């Protein structure tokens, strides 16, 4: 039954991902064709005792050099929670989360090299000495993008909002297309919007897919909140009443560490 449920989720969500929403004149963003779904790896990491972030980052820099040499380097970002859902009773078990975005074939090649080449295995061993990281894989697609802002801004803010659909993919896709048209006309501070659908290792996520919204600064984030407070909440309420149940947004600080 669980396998059938997972298969249904894939059949419903993937058409949403493959709908044409983004970048009408140029579908390339950070070296990837974001008109199509791409792979997004999440590393949820906690540093080992005595290891500093500087120690860990030195390994990441060596990894990126290795990945560039082997022509498998991803878009690489790191996020820290700013406004999270966690409490003293439910603390976040990680120090940070990293996201590595790449097309599927390139990422498969990267993992083959990581697991079988001498240099890849050495880096993997070093990685595991520095931190414990739970690794997850997901489908993702950008639905709205201010390309210039996204490719030039290395320090930004990202909200995550996990949702579970109430309707079929046609209705959800149409609603997302309507939302993209509204963003294109008036982004109210947002420079990017994407959806993420886990495909491997993420059975315990808080929803079946996530909305990601990207902001260049906190002023832009609060501009969006003002828009919601002055009437935009009606659209959010309609979405959650009729299209999907969502957990609510969490805001993370994001640093872009590498672009291919």
Residue ranges and their predicted role:
Residues 10-19:
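Bacterial N-terminal signal peptides
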Residues 23-260:
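Short S/T/G/P-rich N-terminal loop/turn motif that feeds into the first structured element of a domain
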Residues 1-11:
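Bacterial N-terminal signal peptides that target proteins for export
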């Amino acid at each position: 039954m669980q396998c059938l449920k997972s298969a249904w989720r894939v059949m419903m969500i993937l058409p949403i991902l493959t709908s044409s929403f983004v970048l009408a004149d140029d579908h390339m963003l950070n070296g990837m064709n974001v008109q199509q779904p791409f792979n997004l790896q999440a590393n949820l990491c906690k540093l080992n005792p005595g290891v500093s972030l500087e120690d860990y980052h030195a390994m990441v820099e060596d990894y990126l050099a290795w990945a560039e040499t082997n022509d498998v380097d991803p878009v690489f970002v790191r996020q820290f929670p700013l406004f999270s859902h966690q409490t003293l009773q439910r603390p976040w078990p990680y120090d940070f989360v990293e996201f590595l975005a790449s097309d599927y074939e390139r990422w498969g090649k990267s993992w083959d090299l990581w697991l079988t080449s001498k240099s890849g295995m050495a880096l993997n061993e070093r990685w595991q000495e520095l931190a414990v990281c739970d690794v997850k894989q997901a489908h993702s697609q950008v639905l709205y993008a201010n390309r210039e802002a996204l490719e030039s801004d290395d320090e930004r803010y990202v909200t995550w909002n996990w949702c579970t659909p109430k309707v079929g993919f046609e209705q959800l896709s149409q609603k997302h297309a309507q939302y993209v048209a509204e963003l294109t006309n008036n982004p109210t501070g947002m420079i990017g919007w994407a959806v993420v659908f886990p495909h491997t290792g993420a059975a315990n996520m808080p929803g079946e897919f996530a909305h990601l919204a990207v902001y260049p600064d906190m002023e832009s984030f609060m501009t969006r909140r003002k828009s919601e407070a002055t009437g935009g909440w009606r659209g959010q309420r309609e979405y959650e009443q009729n299209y999907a149940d969502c957990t609510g947004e969490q805001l993370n600080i994001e640093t872009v560490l590498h672009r291919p």
